[in-house]
């Protein structure tokens, strides 16, 4: 394999098994080794997943591959042994570490990840062939899930038995340890007693001892005293305290209404305290009503704002807008060669645009393969990036010509294309129009419909001709 741009573009070319090595010019640094490892693993695992027969370009005639207990030599034998892996493989790489070797200026790469949800460990030894050229000297692949299963079974067996094979412990000495642990367990509940008095009272109520009953009796009269102190300070402020006895002198109280004569008897015992409480309740009721009415208004507004239908609609609008900003149209690809399918071209586009950012989808319509003998037709594709930063990086790498069209250098072996392709942001199109290399326009929601028949009235030729002419604008 080969790195062509001072380890910055992460592009590596295989050497097809040519093992004639030359002396290196400069030693590798740790950062350079990590860049070599990242670029190699990106191309290697994509090739294993999509075109497994093409991995011969990474190995030489004397390269070795270790798969568990099997060892093979040579690129052809390595491909046969790689076929033991499942046909549909999904690699998920968790860690890639690259280290320079102390001799031959090689690179050691350790990879940890999962293939079809099964954890594995793979190590590569890259040998240097000339300046900035590498090939795989040795490759070791090993599943690691079986080792963890064996260790867990051993731990279970050791934990179930003691030192002398007894479950209770060694020589029955565990009884002492249980005694020593008891005072520690009793000392733990002590700190919660320093918490607030409300929590302490709740715990005391749960206990049925007579001491707890005495504590409750001693603490209960303190609460009304604390509650009565602030009313005594606020009592001088309101003056209508003297008016309440006049209000209570109704005809029912003067004549005598049987059970209604009890309130004046209760006032004789503690009229001062009860009058203060009644005046406070009388003044607090209107303020309580105002607070409740004021609290209902923001709650109603919050319920309207947090309605599920509104949130769903806002989420859909934001997701649609975000998706449109992440779509790119790639066109202007001349067809020197027409492949049998679009899979190879889509995979090549993924490899080229991966350096700009993560790719969510690459879609090439089937009709780009029509009329293979007609070289005037161009191929095109639709690319969806994972985030907006990737789209921005693509347009920063492109250049704009005199006509305002963005051009991006591109090489696609599937179509034999090596030149500048056109790129533009993909937007929603009106019903009559189409996306043709940036031609056409975006029809906003609620806007006027283009008519060929004039400024007013129906279009010429009826509605049918009007829809046909809409795509020609």
From Swiss-Prot:
Processing and modification events after translation: Phosphorylated.
Residue ranges of every copy of the RRM domain listed in the record: 326-420
Annotated GO MF terms: mRNA binding
Biased composition (Low complexity): 221-249, 261-296
InterPro entries linked to this entry: NTF2-like_dom_sf, NTF2_dom, Nuclear_transport_factor_2_euk, Nucleotide-bd_a/b_plait_sf, Ras_GTPase_bind_prot, RBD_domain_sf, RRM_dom
Effect of a null allele: Shorter lifespan at both 20 and 25 degrees Celsius and lower survival rates following heat or oxidative stress. Increased brood size. Does not suppress heterochronic phenotypes in lin-4(ma161) background animals. Reduction in the number and intensity of pqn-59 stress granules in embryos but does not affect granules formed by tiar-1. In another study, RNAi-mediated knockdown results in reduced formation of tiar-1-positive stress granules in response to heat shock or starvation.
Annotated GO CC locations: cytoplasmic stress granule; cytosol
Listed Basic and acidic residues bias regions: 173-187, 198-218
Primary localization: cytoplasm
Biased composition (Polar residues): 300-320
SMART domains per record: RRM
Domain NTF2: 36-143
Localization, UniProt: Cytoplasm, Stress granule; Cytoplasm
The entry's keywords: Cytoplasm, Phosphoprotein, RNA-binding, Stress response
Comp. bias regions, Gly residues: 431-444, 453-464
GO biological process annotation, one example: stress granule assembly
Region feature Disordered, mapped onto this chain: 155-320, 424-473
General function of this protein: Plays a role in, but not strictly required for, the formation of stress granules during heat, oxidative stress and starvation. Does not play a role in temporal patterning during worm development.
Name the UniProt record assigns to this protein: Ras GTPase-activating protein-binding protein gtbp-1
Source taxonomy: Eukaryota, Metazoa, Ecdysozoa, Nematoda, Chromadorea
């Amino acid at each position: 394999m080969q790195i062509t741009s001072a380890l910055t573009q992460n592009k590596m070319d295989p050497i097809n098994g040519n093992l004639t090595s030359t002396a290196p010019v400069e030693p590798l640094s740790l950062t350079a080794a990590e860049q070599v490892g990242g670029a190699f693993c990106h191309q290697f695992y994509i090739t294993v997943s999509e075109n497994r027969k093409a991995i011969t370009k990474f190995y030489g005639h004397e390269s070795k591959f270790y798969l568990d207990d099997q060892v093979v030599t040579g690129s052809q034998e390595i491909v046969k042994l790689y076929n033991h892996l499942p046909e549909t493989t999904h690699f998920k790489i968790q860690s890639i570490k690259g280290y320079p070797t102390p001799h031959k200026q090689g690179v050691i790469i350790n990879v940890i990840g999962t293939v079809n949800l099964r954890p594995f460990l793979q190590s590569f030894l890259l040998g240097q062939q000339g300046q900035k050229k590498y090939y795989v000297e040795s490759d070791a692949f090993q599943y690691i899930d079986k080792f963890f299963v064996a260790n867990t079974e051993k731990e279970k067996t050791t934990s179930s038995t003691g030192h002398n094979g007894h479950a209770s412990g060694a020589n029955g000495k565990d009884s002492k340890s249980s005694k020593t642990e008891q005072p520690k367990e009793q000392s733990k509940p002590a700190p919660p007693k320093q918490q607030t008095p409300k929590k302490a009272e709740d715990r005391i109520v749960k206990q049925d001892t007579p001491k707890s009953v005495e504590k409750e009796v001693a603490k209960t009269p303190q609460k009304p005293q604390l509650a009565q102190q602030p009313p005594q300070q606020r009592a001088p402020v309101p003056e209508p305290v003297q008016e309440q006895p006049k209000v209570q002198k109704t005809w029912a109280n003067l004549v005598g209404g049987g059970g209604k004569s009890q309130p004046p008897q209760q006032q004789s015992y503690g009229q001062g305290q009860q009058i203060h409480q009644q005046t406070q309740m009388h003044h607090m009721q209107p303020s309580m009503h105002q607070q409740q009415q004021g609290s209902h208004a923001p709650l109603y507004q919050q319920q309207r704002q947090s309605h599920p239908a509104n949130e769903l609609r806002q989420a859909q609008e934001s997701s649609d807008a975000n998706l449109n900003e992440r779509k790119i149209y790639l066109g202007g690809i001349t067809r020197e060669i027409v492949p049998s399918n679009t899979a190879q071209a889509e995979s090549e586009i993924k490899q080229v645009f991966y350096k700009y950012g993560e790719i969510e989808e690459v879609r090439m319509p089937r009709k780009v393969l029509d009329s293979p003998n007609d070289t005037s037709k161009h191929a095109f594709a639709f690319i969806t990036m994972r985030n907006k930063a990737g789209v921005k990086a693509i347009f920063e790498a492109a250049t704009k010509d005199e006509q305002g069209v963005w051009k991006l250098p591109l090489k696609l072996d599937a179509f034999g294309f090596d030149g500048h392709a056109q790129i533009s942001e993909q937007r929603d199109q009106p019903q009559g129009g189409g996306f043709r290399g940036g031609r056409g326009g975006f029809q906003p929601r609620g806007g006027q419909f283009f008519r060929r028949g004039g400024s007013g009235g129906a279009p010429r030729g009826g509605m049918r001709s009007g829809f046909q002419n809409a795509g020609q604008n």
